[in-house]
Amino acid sequence: MDLITAAAGRGREYGAVERAGYTHWAPTAVARTGLGGSADRRVGAAGRGGAVRSLSAMELSTGLSVRVTHAYNGVTRVSDGTLDSGGHLMQRRDVLRLSALAGAAGVLTLDPMTFTQADAAGTADGPEQTRTLSGHLPTGAPDFVYVPVEVPRGVREIAVSYSYDKPTVPAGTQGNACDIGIFDERGTELGGRGFRGWSGGARTEFAISAEEATPGYLAGPVKAGTWHVVLGPYTVAPQGLDYKITVTLRYGAPGTTPEQGAYPPQRAKGRGRAWYRGDSHLHTVHSDGKRTPAEVVAAARAAGLDFITTTEHNTISSHTAFEGLWGDDLLILTGEEITTRNGHVVALGTDPGVFIDWRYRARDNRFGQFARKVRQAGGLVIPAHPHGTCVGCNWKFGFNEADAVEVWNADFTPDDEITISEWDNTLVAASRGDGRWLPAVGHSDAHREPQVVGLPQTVVLADDLSRTALQEGIRAGRSWIAESSKIDLTFEAVGGRGKHAGIGERLKVGGAAEVTVRLKVSGVGSGCSVRFITDQGQLYGTPVPDSGELSAEWRTTASYAAYVRAEVRRAPADGGASGIPGPMAAMTNPIWLGER
């Protein structure tokens, strides 16, 4: 590494400078520049290094403007840049983008990684070329950092690996976490056609060819043009994030893309109009899950489910991965968990092969656009775990575009309690004519053992076991949630002259007319209790016998209770001393009372 002593600059010494993240161009000269960008002070020659560092007791000036002259294969180019707090060179264009993140999600595009076409390209076992790129991202980096990759003709396979540092951080601060994905030559336009895969932080490497692709990625020809590896620095440590990306192009005959795998059928045999049990938030090895599709299906059947939905994080590669796993007893729907930095949303039952983009925040005002895309693709928009405690899980987009809301996610926890309380407040508002009500659903969000597929599950009254019928039932609120298929219940409200309403329906009676509310529940075990919740709060409660079976009846009027819903709760851990109810075993959507 060359040492440079400034001809003017009070004798400060600077180490070698290299364009951050562009390691195959060797810096040959460094100059300090003024505000106008012209090279006004020669610093000296530079060798390889990766950052500007103090090689003696020097003060490193953050914000120092520099111009680096690079040479590669006889070609010379110039990069203007600014030093960050770690002495890393950031291109001037990148600095401007880092300081203006008002655009969609904040984007930084680096200079391209270039390859030369191999002489033996097109042969069955052609050569391969590898480029490695290193760089540094400061705290406050954009959500997405794009690395253009110039792919020449004759490439059979593109393979990418990456790593980043994970330094110890002060208590109360986030460490480094960085996702990865790729877009092909069709571009990175939001909602465009260039998406070829995403693995989040679940993998450190992936490969794509015509014949096959790593789970989470889409197989297909590797066409010439500008591809983009995309980094998603989810959280960045106070020290910043040092990353390294390696791209390998393998040349040879392109191969043949296999015929597209069969998508799941949209109807199963079913039982006609009936209650169907399902889990519509599930992950496999196609995102950050550990189960294979076959293992998920086996677990679903063991849980007594009638339908499931595959919902991988920001990818649709699983849509063809369930071929041969469905049957008369199990309907498999396709979808996606759209995983943004401001909350996650389940796209339930979208058309197979339809990808929904995730690269936006609430401040970008783009969610409505993509919620409409979900519905155009035949899906439902269901915010997931709105009060989840993981980074980026908290829901920030509001509920105006939602078709339902996931109020119970996996094992019942305090964030589910908060979500249910918030949801119940929306029911109260809707009962007074302030907005519409959203049906509640529950899903397991199961990723791996010991997480249980079907805990919880949504039980839907549908005309048959089909995508359309199930979605109609969910959208109408004709559903309830249970922790397992061992639990069964019926819930109804009955008025005079034979009037009757079930879950999600309205019993149209006068305000003073007597209404009888009936619940039958079984399979809940001992120690549980039943609660009837209305717009006035809890108005009825009773313990469940040790047999786990109960028939409960309560009388009210529409003027006293605008709606009623049922909860079956397990005993609280503290015996009820705190007044906080125990975990949920089952819950229903409301039955509405009154003419309006």
What are these model-derived regions, one by one?
Residues 1-4, 36, 40-43, 49, ...:
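N-terminal secretory signal peptides
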Residues 110-136:
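C-terminal segment of N-terminal export signals and the immediately downstream linker at the start
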Residues 127-139, 166-214, 538:
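Surface-exposed beta-strand/loop patches in noncatalytic accessory domains
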Residues 152-159:
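Extended extracellular/luminal ectodomain segments enriched in beta-structured repeat modules
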Residues 158, 219-238, 561-563:
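Noncatalytic modules at the cell exterior or secretory-pathway interfaces
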Residues 237-248:
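Edge beta-strands of jelly-roll/beta-sandwich modules across compartments, strongly enriched
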Residues 252-254, 444-596:
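C-terminal functional module detector
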Residues 262-401, 406-425, 429, 435-450, ...:
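A metal-dependent hydrolase metal-coordination microenvironment
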